[in-house]
Amino acid sequence: MTPEKYRPTITPDLPNRQWPNQRLTQAPIWASVDLRDGNQALANPMTVEQKLKLWDQLVAIGFKTIEIGFPAASQLEFDFARRLIEENRIPDDVTVQVLVQAREHLIKRTYEALQGVKQAVVHVYNTTSTVQREKVFCKSKADIKAMAIQGAKWVQSYAKEHPESDWVFQYSPESFSQTETDYAVEVCQAVMDVWQPTPDNRCILNLPATVESTSPNRFADQVEYFITHLKNRESAIISIHTHNDRGCAVAAAELSLLAGADRVEGTLLGNGERTGNMDIVTLAMNLYSEGIDPELNLSDPDSWVPVIEEVTKIDTHVRHPWVGEAVYTAYSGSHQDAIRKCLMRQKDDEPWNVAYLPIDPKDLNRSYEAIIRVNSQSGKAGAAFVLTQEYDLNLPKWVQQDFAPVAQTIAEQAGGIVSHQMLYDAFIQHYRLDKSLAELNNYQLSRKEGKEHLSVEVNGETWQGQGNGTLSALCDAWQRRTGQQVDVLDYSEHALHEGKDSKAIAYVYVQQKNTKTIGIAMAEDTVSAMIQALLSTIR
C-alpha cells in the first residue's frame, strides 16, 4: 500500500463552528431516493411492477417526498412516472421528486413525464467538483456556474408551461463534498438568483457527499460554512445527500443536521452506489432512541424488510443496525445476565433503561423470547431467561447456578444454539421431573400451638412430623422415620401461569450430612409441590 498517493480533502477553516453545541429535537424532512439512486446501483434494475411495489411500501412507511426516478433517462423511468400519475397512485400529501441533468432536452422530457401531477420537486444538478471540472468536463469555474444558471432557467421556464401543477425547484452541486465550499456557495447563490425563492416559496439546495471523502465532522463544517455564507438562507431548504464510502454516511447526515440542514435524502437499509446511500432506517431509529419521533412508521420490519430485499435482491445483514435479525440477541453470559435483571426491574411507566438494549425490541415487533439465545458462550442467565420467558419457570439463583453446567454441556455438544425445547427437556430430565421416585398419596396439614402438624402418606406409608412450616414438618417426619437429619437451606415456589387452574412449582435446596441437593416438583397446589420437591431430594 502507498498512502503517499493520497491527499486529504480541503475543507473550510471554521474556528467558531456552532454545530458541536447543538442537539437534535425533531426529525428532518425525509426524502426517499430508493427508486432512483438506489435503483441505479442494482445489477438488475427494478421493473415497473417492482417499482410500484416499492412505491406502495414507501408510502405506507410515511415518506412525504419520494424521488421516483430520472424520467428522461429511459422509457421505463418515463412510463413509471406516467403510471403513478395516470392511475392516481400519488396521495395528496405525497410529493414526487424527479432527477434531471442541466440539459434542455432532458428537462423538457421530464416535464412531459410529469404532466398532470399535482405537485412535484424537479431536481436539477450539475457537477462542481475540482476533479470533474478539470478532468471530466474540462471546464472552468465560470463555465460550470453558467451551466448551473442555464439549467435553473430551463427548469423555471418549462414549469411555467404547466401552471396546473405546484412545482418545487431543487438544485444540487454534485460532489459538493469535493467542491471548494466558497465556490459551491457562489454557484448555489447564482441559482437562487434565477429562481427568486421566498420564505413562503422556498427552493431546495441539496448538498451531496456524492463520494464520501472526509470525516463526518469536517463535512458538517462544510455544511455550516455553506449555510452561514448563503444569502437569503431563510428562502432555501438545505438538504443533505450522503454516501457511505468511508462508512460514515449516517454520522455525516446526523452532524449535518446539527450544522443546520433541514432535509435528508437516503434509502431504506442504505442501498446505493458503491458502499451505499445514507440509511434512513438507521438515522430515523437513532432519533427514536433519543425520544424523537422519526415521523416514519418503521415499527414492523418483518413486513417491509422483505419487500426491500425482494426488489433489490440484496439480503439484510443480521447485524444491520436496529433491524437485523441478531441485533437484539445476546449470547454472552454477562450480557444475558444484565439484560435479564434489567427487564425484571423495568416498569412500563418508566423511561426505557435496559443494559445492552438501546430500545425496547417490542417497538420493532421483536419478542423478548428472541433476545437471549443459549450457546457455549452463555452463562446461567441465558438458560434462566429462556426458561422464564418460554416456560414460566422463575428459577432461584441457586437453581440457575446448578443448571448452568448442564446447559453448557448441551450447547457444546450441539455446537451452536440450543433450542428452547432442548433446554426445557434437559431441565426436566436433570431434575427428574419426568419420574416419580416417591408417590404422594395424601397429606393432612394442621396448625396447633404455633406448630405445623403434617401427616403424609407416601407410597402407602404414613409419616408424621411437626415444625415451623410444611418443609420443616416433613423433615421432622423423615427424621422420625429414618433417624436421618435433613436441613432446608432455601426454597422457593410460584404458580406456573396466571389463573385458578394454574399448577404450582416448588424448588427446595437441602443438606443431608455433607451433601447438598436440589429438588423440584410440579403439582396441583403449592403444598403438594413443596412436599414432592423435598421428597425428591431425600428418597
Curated annotation (Swiss-Prot):
GO molecular function terms listed in the Swiss-Prot or TrEMBL record: 2-isopropylmalate synthase activity; acetyl-CoA C-acetyltransferase activity; magnesium ion binding
Disulphides: none
Cofactor requirements of the protein: Mg(2+)
InterPro entries membership: 2-isopropylmalate_synth_dimer, AIPM/Hcit_synth_CS, Aldolase_TIM, IPM_Synthase, LeuA-like_post-cat, LeuA_allosteric_dom_sf, LeuA_N_DRE-TIM, PYR_CT
Enzyme kind, highest EC tier: transferase
EC number: 2.3.3.13
Annotated keywords: Amino-acid biosynthesis, Branched-chain amino acid biosynthesis, Cytoplasm, Leucine biosynthesis, Magnesium, Metal-binding, Transferase
Residue ranges of every copy of the Pyruvate carboxyltransferase domain listed in the record: 28-302
SUPFAM superfamilies associated with the record: 2-isopropylmalate synthase LeuA, allosteric (dimerisation) domain, Aldolase, post-HMGL domain-like
GO-annotated biological processes: L-leucine biosynthetic process
Predominant cellular place of this UniProt entry's protein: cytoplasm
Pfam families assigned: HMGL-like, IPMS_D2, LeuA_dimer
Catalysis performed (reactions): 3-methyl-2-oxobutanoate + acetyl-CoA + H2O = (2S)-2-isopropylmalate + CoA + H(+)
HAMAP family assigned to the protein according to its UniProt record, in alphabetical order: LeuA_type2
Function, as annotated: Catalyzes the condensation of the acetyl group of acetyl-CoA with 3-methyl-2-oxobutanoate (2-ketoisovalerate) to form 3-carboxy-3-hydroxy-4-methylpentanoate (2-isopropylmalate).
Assembly and binders: Homodimer.
Family that this chain belongs to: Belongs to the alpha-IPM synthase/homocitrate synthase family. LeuA type 2 subfamily.
Name of the protein in question: 2-isopropylmalate synthase
